[in-house]
C-alpha cells in the first residue's frame, strides 16, 4: 500500500443549547436572571477569597445558580452538563487548558476538595474562574483555572424541612453489534490469505459455527446479547434538607442516599450496585454584632459492590468463536448418558442454575463468564470526613471598613477493597458423534472449586487535606462615588496521599486592591507571592501580578437613559502567573534541579573480577524556574430590553512558557552517551505553548404568564500552537513547532499500488 504522512489539526468548538420552561421558577446564571429577580447588583458571586456583586465582575468568571437550577433540571453530578450554561467550560477544562500534569483546581467552600464528593442538592452556586486575573490570588495550583463550589446555608428563621425523592432509568441507546463467529472466521481467513498465510478455519468449521445447531461445541458468543445485559438500569435517590435558626444562629443540613444499579443480568454481576449515604451540616453563628463564625462538616459513606472479572475489557478483545470447541457454559444435557466418568465429575461439580457446567480448554482454564459466576465478588469502600471552620471579625472600631477573617479545614478520606476470592474448576469436553448427534463422551477437569470464606482486604489508601487562610479585608466608599476594597491574604494547604512521600503543598501571600468610580470606571490589581519546594533554594519564590480595567458604558450619559440597553460593560485584563504544577519529568516532581550520580560494575583488569565505576545520569540546573502563564483577555457583557437578551463574551490569548525538557538537542551530543548510559544534560525550561480563542453565553429570557422561558447557547472556540520546541528531527514532518497542540498525527493512505513498476519506483516502506 502506498502511504504518505498526514497531520490532522483539530480546533475545538463546543456549543450547547439549553431550553428551560419551568413553572414559577427562576434559572439564573452569570448571564441571565428573570424579571422578578431582585436587583442584579445584589446578586453576589463567590470568587477568590471574597464575594463580589455580579455586575462588578471584570470578566473571566461565570456562575451557575445550582440551587434554583435543581428545581427544574435534576442532575446527579455536581458539574453535570455545566457546559450548557457556561461559555469557556467544555466539561474537562477551562479555556482549553491542558491537564497533562494537573488540571483546574476545585474548591468546595474555599477548601481544595473533589467535585464528586458534593451532591448537587447540597450546592448553592458554582463559580467558574477561567481568566488568569480571576485565579491569581490562589497562586500556583489554580494556574489552569478554578471551579469554586459553594454549598447551601441556612437563612430562614424557625424550621424548614424539605424531602425529595427521585427515581430514574439509565437506558442504553444501543449496544455494539458483535461480529458472528462465521463472519469473524471468514474475515480472519481472508486476512491470512492477504498475508500469504494458510487459512486457519475450514469451510466445515465455518458452516458449523454459522448454522448454530450446536452452540456448545461451536460457540457464537455475543457479549452484548440480551442473555447477559439489560437494556436499562435504575437509580434511586432521596434527600432531606433541614434548615432554620433564630436571631444568633442559622443552620442547614442535608441527608442524602442513592443507589445505582448495573446492566448485568447474570451471575454475581446481577447484584452489582453502588450506594452512597452522606450527611452535611453548615452552621452560621453571630457571636456578637462584630464577630461571626461558621462551621461546616460532612461525612460520606460510599460502597460499590461488583463481581469478579473485567467484562467490558473481555468484550473488546474476545473472539466470538472462542474458546475452541467449548462455550463458556455447557448444558449437562450434552453429556452422553453412558459417559459414566463425566457424570461422576458432574455429581460433585458446582453447576450454574443446576444444569450448566463451566467449560474451557487447557490453554484457557478461566474466562470472564466463569469469573462472574464463580470467582467471587469485591466491594470498594470509601469513607470521607470533611470539616472546616472560620471566623470573621469586624474591625470597624479600629478603621471603618476593616475586617479580619480566618479559615481552617481538615479533611480525611480512606478507601479499601474487600473481596471473597474463590477458585473454580472448568471442564474440557471431548466431543463425538453419538447416534447422529454431537455429544460429550468425556470430560477433563482443570482446577478446583474452592471457597475459603476468608474476606481479603487490599488497596488501602488514606488521604488528608489541611488548609489554612487568614486575611484582612477593607471595604469603604468615599463621597458616595469612590468605592475602594482591598485584601491581604496568607493561605496554604497540604494534601498527603498514601504511597506518596511528598505532600502536594501550596503556600502563598496575596494582595488585591479594587477601585471603581460610581460603578462606571473600574480597576483591579492582584498580586500573589508564591513559594514552591520543587525548585532550588534561592529560586523558590516568585511574584504573579494581574491588572484589570473595566468600563460600564451603561452609566455614561449617552446610554444612561437608553430603553434598549439595561447594562453594558467591557473590561480588559493582563496577567502573569508563575506555576509549579507543570514542573514534572514523568512522575518526578522534586529535586529536578539536582544532578544525579549512580554507580555500577563493569569489566575488570583481570579475569573473574569487576570494577565499580560512577557515572552521571543528569546534570545540575539550579536556575530551573517556574512555568509562566502570560495572558491577555477582553470581556464584553450586556443586557438588552429589560433582560430579554443577555450576552457574556470573552476573548483570550495566553502563552504557557518554560515547559521542561530533559535532553536538550542544542547541547553537545557527547554529554549524553549510550554505553554506559550516562548524561550530563540538565533539565531546562524551554518549550512554549499558545492558545487563542473566545467564549460566549447568550440567553433569551421571556416571562409568559406564570411560565419563565429561557433559551441559551454557549460556545468556545480556540486554536492552539506549539510556539517553541526543542527538536532536531531528520524529517520536517516530525517537528511539532508551529503546529497544533491537539493535532492527531499519522499516516494517510495514498491508495494501493497499481503496478509492479510503481512499486519499484516508490521508496522502500517499513513499519
Where are each of the predicted segments found?
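Short, solvent-exposed loop/turn motifs
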Residues: 112-113, 356, 438-440, 766
Amino acid at each position: 500500500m502506498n502511504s504518505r504522512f498526514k497531520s490532522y489539526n483539530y480546533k475545538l468548538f463546543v456549543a450547547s443549547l439549553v431550553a428551560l420552561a419551568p413553572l414559577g421558577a427562576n434559572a439564573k446564571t452569570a448571564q441571565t436572571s428573570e424579571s422578578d429577580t431582585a436587583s442584579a447588583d445584589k446578586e453576589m458571586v463567590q470568587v477568590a477569597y471574597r464575594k463580589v456583586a455580579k455586575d462588578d465582575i471584570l470578566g473571566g468568571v461565570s456562575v451557575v445558580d445550582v440551587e434554583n437550577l435543581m428545581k427544574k433540571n435534576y442532575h446527579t453530578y455536581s458539574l453535570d452538563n455545566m457546559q450548557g450554561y457556561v461559555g469557556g467550560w467544555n466539561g474537562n477544562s477551562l479555556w482549553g487548558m491542558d491537564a497533562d500534569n494537573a488540571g483546574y483546581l476545585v474548591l468546595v467552600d474555599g477548601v481544595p476538595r473533589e467535585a464528586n464528593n458534593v451532591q448537587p442538592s447540597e450546592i448553592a452556586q458554582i463559580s467558574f474562574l477561567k481568566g488568569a486575573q480571576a485565579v491569581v490570588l490562589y497562586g500556583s495550583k489554580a494556574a489552569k483555572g478554578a471551579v469554586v463550589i459553594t454549598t447551601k446555608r441556612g437563612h430562614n428563621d424557625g424550621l424548614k424541612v424539605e424531602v425529595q425523592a427521585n427515581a430514574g432509568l439509565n437506558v442504553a441507546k444501543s449496544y455494539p453489534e458483535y461480529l458472528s463467529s462465521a463472519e469473524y472466521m471468514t474475515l480472519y481467513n481472508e486476512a491470512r490469505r492477504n498475508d500469504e498465510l494458510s487459512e486457519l478455519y475450514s469451510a466445515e468449521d465455518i458452516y458449523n459455527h454459522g448454522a448454530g445447531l450446536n452452540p456448545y461445541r461451536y460457540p457464537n458468543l455475543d457479549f452484548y446479547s440480551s442473555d447477559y445485559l439489560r437494556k436499562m438500569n435504575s437509580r434511586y435517590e432521596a434527600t432531606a434538607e433541614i434548615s432554620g435558626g433564630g436571631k444568633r444562629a442559622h443552620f442547614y443540613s442535608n441527608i442524602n442516599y442513592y443507589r445505582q444499579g448495573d446492566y448485568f443480568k447474570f451471575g454475581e454481576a446481577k447484584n452489582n450496585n453502588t450506594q452512597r449515604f452522606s450527611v452535611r451540616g453548615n452552621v452560621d453563628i453571630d457571636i456578637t454584632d462584630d464577630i461571626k463564625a461558621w462551621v461546616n462538616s460532612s461525612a460520606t459513606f460510599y460502597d460499590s459492590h461488583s463481581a469478579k472479572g473485567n467484562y467490558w475489557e473481555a468484550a473488546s478483545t474476545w473472539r466470538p468463536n472462542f474458546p475452541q470447541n467449548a462455550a463458556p457454559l455447557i448444558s449437562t444435557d450434552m453429556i452422553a448418558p453412558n459417559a459414566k466418568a463425566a457424570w461422576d465429575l458432574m455429581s460433585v461439580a458446582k453447576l450454574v442454575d443446576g444444569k450448566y457446567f463451566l467449560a474451557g480448554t487447557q490453554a484457557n482454564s478461566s474466562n470472564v463468564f466463569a469469573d462472574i459466576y464463580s470467582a467471587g465478588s469485591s466491594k470498594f469502600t470509601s469513607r470521607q470526613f470533611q470539616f472546616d471552620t472560620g471566623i470573621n471579625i469586624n474591625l470597624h472600631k479600629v478603621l471603618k471598613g476593616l475586617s479580619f477573617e480566618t479559615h481552617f479545614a481538615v479533611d480525611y478520606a480512606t478507601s479499601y477493597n474487600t473481596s471473597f476470592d474463590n477458585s473454580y474448576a472448568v471442564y474440557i469436553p471431548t466431543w463425538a458423534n453419538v447416534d447422529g448427534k454431537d455429544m460429550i463422551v468425556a470430560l477433563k477437569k482443570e482446577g478446583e472449586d474452592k471457597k475459603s470464606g476468608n474476606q481479603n482486604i487490599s488497596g488501602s489508601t488514606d488521604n488528608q487535606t489541611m488548609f489554612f487562610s487568614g486575611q484582612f479585608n477593607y471595604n469603604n466608599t468615599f463621597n458616595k462615588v469612590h468605592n475602594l476594597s482591598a485584601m491581604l491574604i496568607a493561605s496554604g494547604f497540604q494534601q498527603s496521599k498514601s504511597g506518596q512521600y511528598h505532600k502536594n503543598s501550596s503556600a502563598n501571600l496575596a494582595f488585591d486592591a479594587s477601585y471603581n468610580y460610581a460603578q462606571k470606571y473600574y480597576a483591579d490589581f492582584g498580586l500573589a507571592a508564591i513559594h514552591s519546594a520543587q525548585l532550588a533554594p534561592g529560586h523558590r519564590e516568585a511574584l504573579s501580578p494581574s491588572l484589570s480595567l473595566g468600563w460600564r458604558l451603561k452609566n455614561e450619559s449617552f446610554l444612561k437613559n437608553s430603553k434598549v440597553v439595561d447594562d453594558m460593560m467591557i473590561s480588559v485584563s493582563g496577567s502573569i502567573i508563575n506555576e509549579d504544577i507543570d514542573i514534572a519529568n514523568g512522575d518526578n516532581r522534586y529535586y529536578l534541579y539536582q544532578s544525579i550520580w549512580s554507580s555500577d560494575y563493569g569489566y575488570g583488569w583481570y579475569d573473574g573480577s569487576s570494577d565499580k565505576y560512577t557515572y552521571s545520569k543528569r546534570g545540575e540546573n539550579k536556575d530551573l524556574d517556574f512555568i509562566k502563564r502570560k495572558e491577555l483577555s477582553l470581556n464584553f457583557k450586556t443586557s438588552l430590553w429589560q433582560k430579554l437578551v443577555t450576552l457574556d463574551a470573552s476573548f483570550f490569548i495566553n502563552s504557557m512558557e518554560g515547559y521542561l525538557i530533559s535532553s536538550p538537542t542544542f547541547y553537545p551530543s557527547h554529554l549524553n552517551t549510550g554505553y554506559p548510559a550516562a548524561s550530563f544534560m540538565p533539565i531546562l525550561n524551554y518549550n512554549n505553548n499558545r492558545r487563542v480563542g473566545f467564549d460566549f453565553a447568550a440567553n433569551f429570557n421571556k416571562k409568559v404568564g406564570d411560565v419563565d422561558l429561557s433559551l441559551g447557547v454557549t460556545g468556545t472556540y480556540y486554536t492552539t500552537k506549539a510556539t517553541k520546541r526543542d527538536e532536531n528531527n531528520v524529517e520536517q514532518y516530525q517537528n511539532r513547532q508551529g503546529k497544533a497542540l491537539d493535532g492527531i498525527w499519522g499516516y494517510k493512505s495514498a491508495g494501493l499500488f497499481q503496478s509492479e513498476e510503481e512499486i519499484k519506483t516508490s521508496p522502500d516502506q517499513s513499519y
